[in-house]
Design a protein with these regions (language model features):
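Conserved alpha/beta-hydrolase "acid-adjacent" motif
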Residues: 212-220
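C-terminal catalytic histidine-bearing segment of alpha/beta-hydrolase fold enzymes
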Residues: 220, 227-283
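Catalytic nucleophile-loop/oxyanion-hole region of alpha/beta-hydrolase
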Residues: 68-76, 83, 88-125, 252-255
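Primarily recognizes the serine-hydrolase "nucleophile elbow" in alpha/beta-hydrolase
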Residues: 109-175, 187-188
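Short beta-strand/loop motif that positions the catalytic acidic residue
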Residues: 199, 205-207, 211
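Mobile cap/lid helix-loop segments that gate and shape the active-site cleft of serine hydrolases
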Residues: 19, 35, 165-195, 201
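Short beta-strand element of the alpha/beta-hydrolase
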Residues: 52-63
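N-terminal cap/lid segment of alpha/beta-hydrolase-fold proteins
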Residues: 8-51
Length: 283
């Protein structure tokens, strides 16, 4: 279902790509859970927040559930923070040391930590948007739509933005998914589409029409299910963009390839807008 992206290549990419002005990392390696993978970074705009609190984005990266490090995604944190958000990027435990649902449980623990500490850094713990790419989009979708993981904290999730995510697939088909979901039991219970219910958070579901790693039909299926229960779901399909390209389009040199950053930032601003805010107002 998914193909891993080399951690070393992403770290190198993150190192050499131009950094967005107007944003900085303010927390590195804070512990949200025990162990070396239970660490989280925070990024914030450099401009003053004023009297209010900023909405918060929690970004979950992909990597087939078996690879990845937050150190390769600073370009995402800075890009979104420069748009006015407090951005959290956690690591999480990986296959083969763990299997489902451990990586979802880690995402839930990270969200709870963010809610407990966001205000210390100018973030609003009641206005969170979950954003994810690939396997991270799956993790984020499960947190957004399956109430088992966040419980009462799910009320703070105002929206979900998934980039090239798998939401409706056979978890026992193929070696990568099988390794991640071995022993999971009922297959449908592992799928985000199975947990959508009335009152679910709105979604932005973005894919590239050249994605051969995670089929765009996953996003179509989730959008249809959300629409059926009355939840707004926006589908974006970028021409000539592949599975990795939808992520790298967030970086400065490649933003002209697809308006991924603009779309995610506009969606997050809209779903977290406070009553009385002018339409389209950025955080």
């Amino acid at each position: 279902v998914l193909v891993a992206t080399g951690c070393s290549r992403l770290i190198m990419f993150n190192t050499v790509v131009p950094k967005d002005e107007g944003a900085r990392r303010i927390v590195r390696d804070a512990a949200y859970a025990p162990g070396p993978r239970g660490r989280i970074d925070l990024y914030t705009p450099t401009r003053p927040v004023g009297a209010g609190l900023r909405p918060v984005i929690v970004f979950l990266y992909g990597g087939s559930w078996n690879s990845g490090t937050k150190d390769g995604y600073g370009f995402v944190g800075r890009a979104l923070a420069a748009r006015g958000f407090l951005v959290a990027i956690p690591d999480y435990r990986l296959v083969p040391k763990v299997r489902y649902p451990a990586f979802v449980e880690d995402g839930a623990a990270a969200v709870r930590w963010v809610r407990a500490h966001a205000a210390e850094w100018g973030g609003d713990p009641a206005r969170l948007v979950l954003v994810g790419h690939s396997a991270g989009a799956y993790n984020a979708a499960m947190l957004a739509y399956d109430p088992r993981w966040l419980g009462a904290d799910r009320a703070a999730i105002k929206g979900f933005a998934g980039l090239a995510g798998p939401y409706d697939f056979d978890p026992f088909d193929g070696p990568i998914a099988s390794a991640a979901f071995q022993g999971a039991g009922e297959a449908r219970a592992t799928q985000p589409v199975s947990h959508v219910a009335p009152g679910a958070p709105p979604a932005l579901l973005a894919t590239g029409d050249k994605d051969t790693t995670v089929r765009p039909a996953n996003s179509d299926s989730l959008a249809a299910r959300l629409t059926a229960v009355g939840t707004p779901a926006t589908l974006r399909r970028y021409p000539a963009v592949g599975h990795v390209g939808i992520l790298t389009a967030i970086a400065q040199p490649w933003r002209g390839r697809a308006p991924v950053l603009d779309d995610v930032a506009a969606f997050a601003a809209r779903v977290t807008a406070e009553p009385g805010s002018p339409p389209g107002m950025r955080p």
